[in-house]
Amino acid sequence: MIETADAEPEYDDTAIRFLEALWGEGYLSPGGPEEVDRVVEGLSLEGKTVLDIGCGAGGITLHLVDRHGAAHATGYDVEAPVIETARRRAEERGLADRTTFVQAPPGPLPFADASFDVVFSKDALLHVPDKDSLFAEIFRILAPGGIFAASNWMIGHDGDPSPDMKAYIAAEGLSFSMASPQRYRLAMERAGFQDITVTDRNHWYRDVAREELERLKGPLYRTVSAAVGSDYVDKNIHTWEAMQKVLDSGEHRPTHLRGWKPAEGR
């Protein structure tokens, strides 16, 4: 979702087809709209301008408009295949006038200061190595009083990954730059965020991932193989098995983050 500009896409059309078969149309991370709703639980997005960082195939961006009443949502990603899919889906659902999808290279976010009331992200920030610069940019583009709400995959510590975690990351073959919840909190504090909350979701995804693996090995195998090929499915079954080990050990820590940019005068 957030990668280097000159690399081949990590989320190409095959990856999109595979992940949508597992997680639902427009969703390239687990939990579907229900987990998105949990990330923004208790927040009002009605009439707000929202940025979705690492928007992928656009399902979440569209959900924030259609279900949560955002006045306008902008999806940002560095990869062309997912942005093309997101734009097509917005047209199909009649939401093109309330959404914008932006493809741009990694680095400073391509938006003016104080552009958004809300910045959202779902399991994409792990692709960004420099957490301090990332959150400084998020803070910059938020309006005073604005909210940051996200879910992200993290590691339970800031030392070297265990052999099992190294094996899992190698199996994924993606540009992971995982950091601990404590490291994310520190980056948010340095950027200026206040009232920061960090909510662990390991227990939830540990169980969900086990169900996903069972589905891939069972009822989904033939259907998904017809769409992407059995070799691709077999590779991902191996990846899920490696991921389950680090979820069970607690080293893999899916986590929710939330913080506020102070209103002017505070």
Q: What is each model feature region?
A:
Residues S29-E46:
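Conserved alpha-helix/loop element of class I SAM-dependent methyltransferases that forms part
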Residues L51, A57-P108:
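Class I SAM-dependent methyltransferase SAM/SAH-binding core
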Residues G107-V118:
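A short acidic, Gly/Pro-enriched loop at the edge of an enzyme's catalytic core
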Residues V118-D130:
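A short SAM/SAH-binding and catalytic strip from SAM-dependent methyltransferases
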Residues D132-I147:
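A short glycine-rich, Lys/Arg-flanked "PGG" loop and its adjoining helix->strand segment in the class I
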Residues M154-S175:
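Short, glycine-/aromatic-enriched active-site segment of Class I SAM-dependent methyltransferases
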Residues S177-A191:
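Short alpha-helix
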Residues T197-R266:
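Conserved Class I S-adenosyl-L-methionine
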